């Protein structure tokens, strides 16, 4: 068996081969194993020694040999199953030994691992999966013995451990910076193709094709050679995949692959003089003709180098002799089935006079024959003729032109003269011989698999790859040129799905870097041409556009982005756009800035109002979550004025689109959200300006739409108040709606389909609106005595045992807090806080607890300083209420309350209670998740200078939570770490993140990068 060489060196000094491994497998000292306990004791000693990296290398090397001896002599004693369970314990120490930089340790570790893999196969896959990256790392080492040890170990792993994880690991090295690792990957792909189970191999064949393609296109020539060898193996075992790969590369690579098919142990024909491989190098048409050609000597072909053969002479002569049409091109494998007898035996001996009549008309020989490569027979001195070999002048000229006398010697003087004339004619017609034609003549032709769709040329494919590469370049000039070419590429209709995905990623990246008009125009062209295949891209593309428009300051740039957004609105299916927008709103990774949220709401409003058909259904879980998220945006006091008007417009658009779905959707919400919704609808109906009678009226359809929408709003408002007792307030004022019907008559409520079974008579709009004012407490602001009595009565209700009265009292207090009519804080704050805490602790009603949480939130925003001393208790009460609740929506209310508490109360106290909860030995998973979410909101809501002093206290707790067995806790821990990095920067967080494993750290980095690209407020 040939040795595995990791890099090009003269000779094979200091190189370890697979044979060396096999010889060493059982060359170990004999060891007595008396019992399973004896085996375990010896294994413990071995593990102890191998786990010490600083231990004497000779001891460690002997222990590695001892492992093989224990397996050989102990398997029969303790049994295979028990042996395997013990061997798994070696995983860490074997991996450490494979990583060792001493060649003696590495060699023995590699031999031991190879021995285990060959003997036990996938039963020890855990060891193989751990050691494979370490073995690959050794392949890149400059020391030959270490590099080849690592390379041979990878061969054993891939041959005997046939798992998807192993393939995924080796595939990752296709982009390695080290050429030796990329070259080794090709050797491993050959093993996968040859040895792996068909069932497993079938699932990874497309990936194998991509890896071989990458190797064929590699910058390193030796890697390209290895890639061509892997392609030959793929062609031999899976011709369909090979044909697909062949069709996907450009013409130069196709030619290279055909040359690889045709190549033998030597590149020139004279090294395979007159043997079958030469025929396999010819196209099928050439073989058919040359086989019967009467005037071509086998010695002529055998004695000339490949570059000296005049291919046109041979093919045309063969064509003229056989007079048969060309056969369809066949693959190399098909050609190899043709008779493989020695090459010269199939050519008939030249017949006198047979050539002369055809040569002058059909033969097109070259006037001059290219010189052979250095070292070929053409460069050697010509043999001196004997005295008996006297040639006429014509024969000498033919001899000098053809460079060989074996073919010419069989011709008569007359034939030689005619041949010379034909060659002179060819010299005039073929002034510039093409070496490419020579190459093509010698290369087998592959059939291109037929496809239903037009096949794009390899030139187009390479052009797309070139543009993508240029747009990703760090060179400003190269990127600029790539962006210019991008505009023409994206509108091509025959792009593959992979190219569309790559182009979409490039456009998103360019959009995140700067506002470039060419990029925006390219996105518009991209969307117009390929929108049926861009459903996966839509969400990310919209997120980028919203973030970019929200961050943009110049009016001109905003207009350009708006044009691109309008193109998306008009191109994609509205239902798909609504779904993608809802997913974007609810995605916790896309941390949109307030201005970006405004852009999103504007887009959503336009989508609902102009592009979706009236009556379209939207009662989905995604839409419900979107509305809840929108409410949370509107409730944020810092951005309330910016976002609320746009959120209210979206609510009205939803109602106008399908009022039945709107009502059904809000029936699932808690009463507060329902109240908020109909108040929004009511306020928008009331605030519309009344058109003057003498003003120019709108078109009839527009007026009808306004009238219908107004009537629907009335119906919704009235239906929401049917359960309220119609008690007239003396202070009630008659307020008429601002909406007018087409006939300018006052609005009257239409019969509501939703509640027709509950209504016996129509209620006027004024009466229904009056009912909204019944619970108003604004009149108590100035009347302190009345307010004191009112608050005392409500506190008594809250403290009572009746659930309904408790709920009513909490709602009344909440109304006062919302309207700002609760002014007697000095007298009532402590009483109200105790009452709220009692509800959170003792109430059995989840609805009461949710209202109590909202009251606590309002108390914190209004009188945060009064709550300072009760910070820890407040947070604990909220957490207990959420954890003990069976209501799925309780966590949403608790999240909002905790966010308010964390951002308004003393930071030190919030950090202290968070540490205590997260550091509990058996922390409750729901409670830990809520605390981590609270900390995430904390880092999103406060300034970096406030948070820097506490990061050293909080970060270890979050890192610890990342190791939780609960996936929900791990997920929230990742979001919290991302928020920390975004706010404080990677440099500040790096000391803490070093405690994470590489996989976890990579995951955090991925989310950080996503957050950076989508948020204009990133601090990283």
From Swiss-Prot:
Xref: InterPro entries: ARM-like, ARM-type_fold, CLASP_N_dom, TOG
Recorded GO CC terms: basal cortex; centrosome; cytoplasm; cytoplasmic microtubule; kinetochore; microtubule organizing center; mitotic spindle; nucleus
Q: Enumerate composition-biased segments (Polar residues).
A: 329-343, 450-460
Alphabetically sorted, this entry's keywords are: Cell cycle, Cell division, Centromere, Chromosome, Cytoplasm, Cytoskeleton, Kinetochore, Meiosis, Microtubule, Mitosis
Per the record, where are the segments of Low complexity compositional bias? Answer: 259-271, 372-381
* GO terms of molecular function: microtubule binding
Q: Show the segment(s) annotated as Disordered.
A: 259-280, 329-387, 419-461
For biological process, the GO terms are: astral microtubule organization; attachment of meiotic spindle microtubules to kinetochore; cytoplasmic streaming; establishment of mitotic spindle localization; meiotic chromosome separation; meiotic spindle midzone assembly; meiotic spindle organization; microtubule polymerization
Repeat HEAT: residue ranges?
A: 954-992
The protein's location, in the record's own words, is:
Cytoplasm, Cytoskeleton; Cytoplasm, Cytoskeleton, Microtubule organizing center, Centrosome; Chromosome, Centromere, Kinetochore; Cytoplasm, Cytoskeleton, Spindle
Q: Does the keyword Methyltransferase apply?
A: no
Query: How is this protein named in the record?
Result: Protein CLASP-2
């Amino acid at each position: 068996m040939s040795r595995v060489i990791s890099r090009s060196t003269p000779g094979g000094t200091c190189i370890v081969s697979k044979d060396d491994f096999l010889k060493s497998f059982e060359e170990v000292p004999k060891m007595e194993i008396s019992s399973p306990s004896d085996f375990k004791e010896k294994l413990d000693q071995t593990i102890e020694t191998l786990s010490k990296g600083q231990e004497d290398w000779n001891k460690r090397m002997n222990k590695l040999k001892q492992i093989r001896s224990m397996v050989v002599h102990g398997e029969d004693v303790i049994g295979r199953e028990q042996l395997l369970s013990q061997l798994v314990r070696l995983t860490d120490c074997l991996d450490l030994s494979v990583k060792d930089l001493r060649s003696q340790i590495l060699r023995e570790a590699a031999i031991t691992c190879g021995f285990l893999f060959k003997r036990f196969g996938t039963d020890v896959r855990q060891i193989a999966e751990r050691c494979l990256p370490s073995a690959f790392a050794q392949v890149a080492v400059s020391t030959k013995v270490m590099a080849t040890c690592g390379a041979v170990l990878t061969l054993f792993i891939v041959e005997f451990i046939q798992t998807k994880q192993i393939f995924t690991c080796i595939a990752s090295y296709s982009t390695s910076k080290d050429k030796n690792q990329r070259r080794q990957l090709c050797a491993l792909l050959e093993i996968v193709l040859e040895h792996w189970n068909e069932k497993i191999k079938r699932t990874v064949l497309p990936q194998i094709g991509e890896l071989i393609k990458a190797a064929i296109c590699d910058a390193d020539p030796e890697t390209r050679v290895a890639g061509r060898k892997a392609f030959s193996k793929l062609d031999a075992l899976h011709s369909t995949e090979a044909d697909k790969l062949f069709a996907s590369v450009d013409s130069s690579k196709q030619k290279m692959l055909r040359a690889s098919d045709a190549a033998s142990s030597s590149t020139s024909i004279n090294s395979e003089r007159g043997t079958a491989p030469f025929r396999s190098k010819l196209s099928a048409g050439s073989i058919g003709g040359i086989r019967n050609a009467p005037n071509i000597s086998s010695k002529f072909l055998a004695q000339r180098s490949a570059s000296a053969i005049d291919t046109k002479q041979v093919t045309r002569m063969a064509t003229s002799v056989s007079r048969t049409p060309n056969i369809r091109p066949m693959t190399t494998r098909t050609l190899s089935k043709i008779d493989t007898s020695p090459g010269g035996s199939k050519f008939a001996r030249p017949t006198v006079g047979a050539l002369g009549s055809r040569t002058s008309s059909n033969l097109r020989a070259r006037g001059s024959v290219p010189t052979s490569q250095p070292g070929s027979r053409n460069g050697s001195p010509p043999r001196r003729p004997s005295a008996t070999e006297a040639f006429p002048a014509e024969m000498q000229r033919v001899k000098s032109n053809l460079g060989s006398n074996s073919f010419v010697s069989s011709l008569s003087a007359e034939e030689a003269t005619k041949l010379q004339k034909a060659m002179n004619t060819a010299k005039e017609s073929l002034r510039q011989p093409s070496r490419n034609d020579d190459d093509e003549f010698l290369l087998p032709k592959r059939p291109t698999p037929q496809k239903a769709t037009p096949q794009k040329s390899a030139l187009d494919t390479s052009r797309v790859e070139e543009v993508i590469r240029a747009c990703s370049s760090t060179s400003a000039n190269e990127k600029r040129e790539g962006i210019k070419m991008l505009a023409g590429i994206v509108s091509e209709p025959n792009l593959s799905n992979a190219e569309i995905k790559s182009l979409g990623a490039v456009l998103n990246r360019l959009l995140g870097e700067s506002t470039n008009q060419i990029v925006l125009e390219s996105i518009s062209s991209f969307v117009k041409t390929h929108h049926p295949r861009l459903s996966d891209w839509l969400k990310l593309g919209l997120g980028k556009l919203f973030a970019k428009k929200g961050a943009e300051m110049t009016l001109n740039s905003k207009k350009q982005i708006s044009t691109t957004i309008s193109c998306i609105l008009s191109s994609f299916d509205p239902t798909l756009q609504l779904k993608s927008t809802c997913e974007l709103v609810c995605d916790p990774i896309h941390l949109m800035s307030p201005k970006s949220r405004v852009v999103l709401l504007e887009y959503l409003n336009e989508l609902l109002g102009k592009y979706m058909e009236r009556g379209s259904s939207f009662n989905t879980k995604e839409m419900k979550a979107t509305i809840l998220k929108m409410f949370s945006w509107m409730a944020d006091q810092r951005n309330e004025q910016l976002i609320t008007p746009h959120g209210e417009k979206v609510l009205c658009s939803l109602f106008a689109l399908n009022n039945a779905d709107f009502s059904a959707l809000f029936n699932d919400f808690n009463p507060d959200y329902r109240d908020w919704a109909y108040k929004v609808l009511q306020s928008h109906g009331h605030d519309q300006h009344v058109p003057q009678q003498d003003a120019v009226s709108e078109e009839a359809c527009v007026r009808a739409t306004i009238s219908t929408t107004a009537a629907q709003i009335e119906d919704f408002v009235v239906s929401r108040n049917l359960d309220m007792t119609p008690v007239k307030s003396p202070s009630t004022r008659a307020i008429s709606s601002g909406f007018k019907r087409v006939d300018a008559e006052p609005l009257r409520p239409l019969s509501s389909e939703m509640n027709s079974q509950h209504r016996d008579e129509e209620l006027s709009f004024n009466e229904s609106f009056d009912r909204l004012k019944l619970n108003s407490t604004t009149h108590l602001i100035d009347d302190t005595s009345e307010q004191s009595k009112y608050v005392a009565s409500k506190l008594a209700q809250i403290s009572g045992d009746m659930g309904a009265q408790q709920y009513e009292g909490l709602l009344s207090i909440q109304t006062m807090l919302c309207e700002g009519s609760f002014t007697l804080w000095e007298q009532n704050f402590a009483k109200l806080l105790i009452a709220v805490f009692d509800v959170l602790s003792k109430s059995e009603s989840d609805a009461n607890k949710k209202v109590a949480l909202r009251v606590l939130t309002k108390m914190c925003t209004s009188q945060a300083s009064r709550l300072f001393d009760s910070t820890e208790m407040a947070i604990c009460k909220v957490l207990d209420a959420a954890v003990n609740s069976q209501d799925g929506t309780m966590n949403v209310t608790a999240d909002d309350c905790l966010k308010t508490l964390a951002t308004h109360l003393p930071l030190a106290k919030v950090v202290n209670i968070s540490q205590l909860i997260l550091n509990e030995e058996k922390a409750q998973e729901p409670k830990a998740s809520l605390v981590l979410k609270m900390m995430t909101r904390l880092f999103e809501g406060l300034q970096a200078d406030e948070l820097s002093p506490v990061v050293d206290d909080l970060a270890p707790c979050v890192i610890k939570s990342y190791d939780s067995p609960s996936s929900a806790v791990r997920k929230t821990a990742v979001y919290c770490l991302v928020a920390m990095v975004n706010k404080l920067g990677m440099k500040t967080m790096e000391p803490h993140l070093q405690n994470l494993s590489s996989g976890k750290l990579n995951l955090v980095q991925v989310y950080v990068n996503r957050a950076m690209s989508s948020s204009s407020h990133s601090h990283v």
